[in-house]
Amino acid sequence: MSNESNDLEKNISHLDPTGVDNAYIPPEQPETKHSRFNIDRDTLRNHFIAAVGEFCGTFMFLWCAYVICNVANHDVALTTEPEGSHPGQLIMIALGFGFSVMFSIWCFWWGFEPSRFSLFVFGQSHLSSQMCSDVVSSDHCWDGCWWCR
C-alpha cells in the first residue's frame, strides 16, 4: 500500500490543491536550419550583400587587367620578337594592373572596399561610419593633419 501511495504522490506532485496542472512545459521550438548558429535572415542578407559587392569589385579589377594583358600580348608590332616577353609588354601589363586598381578605386568612392559600398547602398551602413572607416583605414592623411605629426 505504501508503494502505491508514493507512486500516486509522485504523479500528482505537480498539481495544485484545486487539481490544476502547474508543471512547466517548455514550448516546442522548431529546429531551423540556422538556429544552431544563431543566424537570422538579416545576417544572411548582409553577408549576401557583402559577397555580391566583393564579387563585383574583384571581377571589375580582374577583367580590366585581363583586357590589358590580352592587348599587350597580341600587339602586332611585337610579334617578330623571339620567345620571351618584350619590355614594352611588361610595362603595359604593369600599367594595366595599376590602372585597373585605380579604376576600381575610383568606382568605389576612393575606398577599394566593395562590400562596404554595397552595405551603404542597401542601407545597412550609414555615411558617417563609411567616412570614419575610410579615415581610419587610409595609409596617409592630408598635410597638416594632427594625427600624422
From Swiss-Prot:
The keyword Ubl conjugation does not apply. Keywords: Cell membrane, Endoplasmic reticulum, Membrane, Repeat, Transmembrane, Transmembrane helix, Transport. Residues 1-35 are annotated as: Disordered. The chain crosses the membrane at residues 48-68, 90-110. One of its GO terms (cellular component) is plasma membrane. The keyword Transport applies. Induction: During exponential phase in rich medium and repressed in minimum medium, hyper-osmolar medium or in sporulating conditions. Residues 69-89 are extracellular. InterPro entries: Aquaporin-like. It comes from the Eukaryota. Residues 1-47, 111-149 are cytoplasmic. It is found in: Endoplasmic reticulum membrane; Cell membrane. It is a multi-pass membrane protein. Water channel required to facilitate the transport of water across membranes. Involved in freeze tolerance, osmotolerance and cell flocculation in liquid cultures. Is non-functional in most laboratory strains. Aquaporins contain two tandem repeats each containing three membrane-spanning domains and a pore-forming loop with the signature motif Asn-Pro-Ala (NPA). Belongs to the MIP/aquaporin (TC 1.A.8) family. This is Aquaporin-like protein 2.
